[in-house]
Amino acid sequence: VGELEWFDAYCKLDKGPGAANELMHLLRNAERDAASKGVVGVRDYEMAENIDTWISRFSQGLDGLRVEAGIYPERLRQAIDDGWHTGDELPGSHGLGHVGAMKMISDGSLNTRSAYCSMPYSGIRPETYGTLSYAPEQIESYMRLAVEHGFDIACHAIGDEANTIVLDCVERTHAHGSIEHAQMLKERDIPRLAQLGLAASIQPQHAMDDRDVITRFWGN
């Protein structure tokens, strides 16, 4: 089972019997727990109708955190048609909720050996470099559409070649936002993040998750 198939299955979980009520209960607990630890805001990149979902949640009193409701490329055109832009306040949120960035997943992950790399993974036959979720021209096209209609981008890129492709697309489209994870970078690409005004959105836990995987599987 590939990641895209898993994503499709994962998105069906929220539609199960009683899932909506259980989810609200879990979210309220999560908000309280986050606030107790000093967390004041989150970015929601669930594969769902996040804008409409958070308008509904704020109307139900789920207002313990600031929220940026992101969207995925497949929902970008609908968000544009509905008149949304990154930074727009969500109705009923009293300033706590805003439209977030367009989230893209450009490649896979290191643990599944699907992060897209410039050299093949060690010890795997047939030889593999990982996978891209979108062709480079698709990544550029979605970024261009986002820029033209006032959306920031948040692009997942883990493998070094995926990061190069994303940086190239940002350079051509003048997109603004972040690279999510930015986990492996070619040395020449590191300064490009600053030159292009991109944030490197890094999760320290991945350094622990993938330390041994990099040593074992990534190409020399």
Where are these regions (language model features)?
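Long hydrophobic segments that form regular secondary structure
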Residues: G130-R172
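Distinct, well-ordered alpha-helical segments
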Residues: W54-F58, A79-H85, N163-H174
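Short catalytic-loop micro-motif centered on adjacent basic/acidic residues
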Residues: V40-D44, D152-A157, G177-E180
